[in-house]
Amino acid sequence: MSTVIEIASNKEIVTVTADSGKTAYDVADLMKRNRVGSIIVIDKKGQPMGIITERDMVKRVCFKNVSASRIKVEDVMSSPLITIMAYDSIDTASRVMTRNKIKRLVVLEADNRIVGMLSVSDIIKHLAKILLDDYDRYRSLRFAVDLS
């Protein structure tokens, strides 16, 4: 069975430090410049503590009619951060996402270092590949049976 680290996105993880004076406006700018839908919030020691997604920005800034340049990173982030270990199974990751009603999981190594991000899309692509591989094997077997 595949592990999380095998299918997690290998895009660069964008982070912002809590208590750095950064605002929701800064986060939106980071998201746009880096073409990402989420940013991990880390503490001063580099440990992950929260996440800011596009949805968080809409719910906590736009819908509340708050100026993005006045609201702090800590007030926008979702916390505590829900994570998955790099060598956990895809099945475990799917259950964690379903149970918590989230679309992304931060992937950690044993030392709590961020090594990737796993999204629902990553899991769907992985499952689609498995189905296509199985179908190709079936067709090969079917062809072999038809020849005999």
Please provide the spans of the model-predicted regions.
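Short, charged helix-to-loop "capping" segments that act as catalytic/coupling loops
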Residues: 2-21, 43-47, 109-111
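Tandem CBS (Bateman) regulatory domains
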Residues: 1-13, 53-83, 89-98, 119-148
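A glycine-centered beta-loop-beta connector
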Residues: 31-34, 39-55, 97, 105-121
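The conserved cystathionine-beta-synthase
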Residues: 17-35, 42, 84-101, 108, ...
